[in-house]
A protein has these predicted regions:
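Positively charged n-region of N-terminal signal peptides that target proteins for export
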Residues: 1-5
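Bacterial N-terminal signal peptides
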Residues: 8-17
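Transmembrane beta-barrel domains of Gram-negative outer membranes and organellar outer membranes
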Residues: 22-160, 175-236
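Active-site rim beta-loop-alpha module in soluble metabolic enzymes
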Residues: 171
């Protein structure tokens, strides 16, 4: 009965977003080195879920962004909508800026060397107060394989991350075809959202839609449980 309930919930969430929802705001959870173009909007729905014992769960995150130009977007993210109830539903509002690195942009245009920084005010919707998530990273593509590597740091407070934590974050994106990528990202933390390795694929669908399918592995039992990750995103 529990398994059926989770499957129904997942189908409802994704059927609604796939029909209304290509830039990529995150790899899986690590913010990507892509930014929404000026005048365009981005919407992405993520579901982390596990339908088997022990501990079946559903956890949803909704990402949105609007490009304002100057390599910057304004963002709003709804975190921690889940079953069983998380008691930590939080709205994050802020920005992300993606800057080509001066001196390298013109010399190595195909390497896409970039510096990304962003921050969100985390406003708990369940009486957990107000906090912050701030992050920055460097990224670039390797010759020949065109693999994009990302490495940086993240600091987030208890409203989303369980405790106040500063952690390493990294990602790998490997193009296979023009539409298909192998992707992985990792947060090095020991609590909740800040402590998972997620690996899988992304696929560019028609009409500016992108599908992501992956599997998450927690750094420890305090971070949560293993399970599947699905995302749909769309640029408007």
């Amino acid at each position: 009965m529990i398994k059926n309930s989770f499957l129904i919930l997942i189908l409802i969430v994704f059927s609604s977003f796939f029909n209304i929802v290509s830039a990529q705001q995150t790899v899986f959870n690590v913010p990507s080195a892509d930014v929404t173009e000026k005048g365009h909007s981005f919407l992405q729905q993520e579901a982390q879920f596990r339908g088997w014992e022990p501990g079946p769960f559903f956890l949803g995150t909704t990402f949105s962004g609007y490009g304002i130009g100057h390599n910057t977007e304004i963002d709003a993210t709804l975190f921690n909508v889940g079953a069983p109830a998380t008691n930590s539903i939080t709205l994050g509002t802020g920005f992300k800026s993606v800057m080509p690195i001066a001196g390298l942009k013109d010399k190595y245009p195909k390497r896409e060397y970039k510096f990304t920084a962003g921050s969100q005010v985390l406003s708990s919707l369940q009486s957990q107060g107000v906090g912050n998530w701030t992050y920055s990273h460097l990224s670039g593509r390797l010759p020949v394989t065109n693999t994009r590597l990302t490495a940086g740091v993240s600091y987030g407070t208890k409203q989303v991350f369980g405790t106040n934590q500063a952690v390493f974050m990294g990602a790998i994106e490997q193009p296979v075809t023009k539409k298909l990528n192998l992707i992985s990202d990792w947060f090095s933390g020991s609590e909740h959202f800040s402590g998972f390795l997620i690996t899988g694929i992304s696929y560019a669908c028609p009409k500016n839609k992108t599908l992501y399918v992956g599997y998450q592995i927690p750094n420890s039992s305090r971070c949560g449980k293993s399970g599947f990750v699905l995302q749909f995103g769309k640029v408007f």
